[in-house]
A protein has these predicted regions:
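Right-handed parallel beta-helix
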Residues: 20-22, 68-73, 96-107, 201-212, ...
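N-terminal extracellular ligand-recognition/capping segment immediately after the signal peptide
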Residues: 1-61, 67, 72-91, 104-105, ...
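Small/polar beta-strand repeat architecture
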Residues: 15-17, 25-51, 111-128, 136-143, ...
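Flexible, charged surface loops at secondary-structure boundaries
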Residues: 12-13, 58-65, 93-94, 140-142, ...
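Extended amphipathic secondary-structure runs
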Residues: 1, 62-84, 189-234
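Short coil/turn segments at secondary-structure boundaries
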Residues: 81-84, 112-118, 291, 312
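Extracellular beta-strand/beta-solenoid scaffold signature
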Residues: 34-60, 81-89, 127-130, 183-196, ...
Length: 328
């Protein structure tokens, strides 16, 4: 019958189910619907698209019955960044192949998507090329923040931090930055944020639109891992970033037949702030993608990459305007 039902621990149902009423469960309690595993069933159960997606994803990583989550063609209104690891709090690593497919994520609201910005002082040495030491106010510096400062190259991110030791580990080393200086740390907000995972491998996103609405960025990868695969997806109007790697979870990453649509079509090329893709690892493959009018299409730091059959352009409406690289 209709009503609200409180389930205090994990529940697995191995028969087909049709849910009436609403379920209330602790965040750490999985609901595994082995014979009715799709997003629509979870929405029926929890009456909230965001919560239903989190619980369905939790089940995906806590059950061997399915390798993929079908979003049932649903459009999920997202009011704040989805912390994918927090949805599966019992796991910080996962290496079995898993897929999310067939739906749309739609950013709504405003304040939840605002950047976190921290200004700090830290010391850098070439002897430890990916570490900042004696970092002031380190507790407030978020993992995944973009780092800016003297000697900091493009797309350098906070991969991890050690608050007790006052040390920040970076995605890449710096150049000519020895000594103590001021750094700016800016944390963008993403529709799907995997950065809470220490390691995530063989994970795939397929046939999904990420409707960022000039509010959110698209996807942030885990800290480490390999063969993240995104194919036949649309990342539409990301405010700052489309697909971000803060570590080496992009090792062997595959981006196939995806469409990156800018939020800045009428902005001069030199004034744009959005970047479609960055990667730090090796063996990245970008194939048959389309991207228009970002500051850069892709920033690739590794080696042995394949960039094939892509169509990207950076132009603006200014006669003899400044050109910026599509690939760097």
């Amino acid at each position: 019958p209709e009503g609200t039902y409180h389930i205090t621990r994990g529940l697995s149902l191995s028969a087909p189910v049709q849910i009436q009423g609403q379920l209330v469960m602790p965040d750490d309690a999985p609901l595994v619907l082995s014979k009715s595993y799709n997003l629509s069933t979870y929405i029926d159960a929890f009456k909230s698209e965001e919560l239903a997606f989190k619980k369905a994803f939790q089940a995906l990583l806590n059950s061997g019955d399915h390798d993929s989550l079908d979003l049932s063609g649903r459009s999920i209104a997202v009011s704040e960044p989805i912390d994918m690891q927090a949805a599966v709090a019992n796991r910080t690593e996962y290496a079995q192949r898993r897929v999310i497919r067939n739906g749309q994520f739609y950013a709504q609201g405003d304040t939840a998507w605002e950047n976190e910005v921290v200004n700090s002082v830290a010391t850098y040495s070439q002897n430890t090329p990916k570490v900042l030491k004696n970092v002031v106010d380190i507790a407030n510096i978020p993992v995944g923040a973009l780092v800016e400062g003297h000697g900091v190259g493009r797309e350098i991110y906070v991969k991890s931090k050690n608050v007790a030791a006052q040390e920040v580990t970076l995605s890449e080393g710096l150049f000519d930055a020895d000594g103590t200086q001021n750094f700016n740390f800016t944390r963008f907000k993403y529709l799907l944020d995997f950065s809470g995972f220490e390691k995530l491998s063989k994970f795939s996103l397929q046939n999904i639109e990420f409707q960022c609405n000039s509010k959110a960025s698209g996807i942030m990868l885990a800290r480490t891992g390999y063969v993240f695969h995104i194919k036949d997806c649309f990342i539409t109007r990301p405010k700052y970033r489309g697909l971000t790697s803060i570590g080496t979870a992009c090792q062997g990453m595959l981006v196939d037949r995806c469409h990156f649509m800018t939020a800045e079509p009428n902005t001069k090329s030199q004034d744009r702030i959005s970047i479609a893709i960055n990667a730090n690892g090796n063996d990245v493959k970008l194939r048959e993608n389309w991207a228009s009018q970002f500051r850069h299409f892709a920033i690739l730091s590794g080696s042995n990459n394949i960039v094939s059959g892509n169509h990207f352009y950076q132009g603006d409406g200014v006669a003899n305007g400044i050109r910026l690289a599509g690939l760097a």
